[in-house]
Amino acid sequence: MKVLTAPLWELAEFEEGKALLDRGKGHVAFSGLYDSQKLHMVYGLSDGFTQKIIVTFSDKRAREIGAEYGFYDRRTMVYPGKDLIFYQADVSGGDLVRERMRVLRALLEKRPVTIVTTMSALMMPQTPLSGIVSRILHFDKKSTVDERKLSAQLVEMGYEKSPQVEEPGQFSIRGGIIDIFDMTEENPYRIELWGDSVESIRSFDVLSQRSVENLDEIAIYPATELMLSEARRQDGFARIKKETKQYAKKLREQGNPEAAHRIETQIKEIEESAQEFGSVVNLESSCIIFIRRRSPFWNFFIRKRRQFFWMSHSICRRRRTHLKQNFGRA
């Protein structure tokens, strides 16, 4: 929208800064801007870049910026951070994971996008994109499906098996009909089989069960960033239990048996949930234990197509220092 950027080009400082960014020459800083002016400036400076990353200091502020910047770019998405405290579950559960997976899908598909995130989310080590790509399932009308094998694959991908699909992250298999509610989609998919061959694929409304659209092919993205085989799951829990035992012993030696009992109980509940129901929501913040090859979020962008914008550089810098000192994230 040139009508929005035209006033900016009348500023010599903007023109100079834009030229430097376009050539990839160093960093540009602007001060004395109000919040609305900052977003206007970001919009102008980001012209020509297909991946725009706006970094702020908190999830609350990220959501505010995401809502405001949607005026400039409808492709704006918020990438929320995960809880940094070891063993603690994501309080937002599936909704938070869904937001993150939608952003990762946009990056995998190399779509133009503006991502609003926080310093902690940017630095958080997680499963590399290659690990997510290898788990994406593709179906078309030439596909054949082993229902038992597919069920095991979907559980590893973080999906929950249920009698009937009602919300994102669930799947059901019954009588040659496979329903999967992809975490990145608005409507679930229904795959109908003839024997083990795909006969039809369609999306449907979860409430009315009526068809929305007939499809030739679909891709099913993981419902979690933490996809674990049984062997990796067992190895991770063995390491957690060993560390928990040492920590509980230390707490009891310090005269705090109640805290020791709480941590042991919490770990036991998380393990039982993962074993019995295939739930990995409570394991997301323990990625560092289960995934040995990790990558920070900032590595997921294409270098020549990306541009970072720090909405409060001094606060973000202090946040980065805090994260490095307390959690060892570079």
Specify the residue positions occupied by each region the protein language model found.
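ASCE RecA-like P-loop NTPase motor cores
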Residues: M1-A330
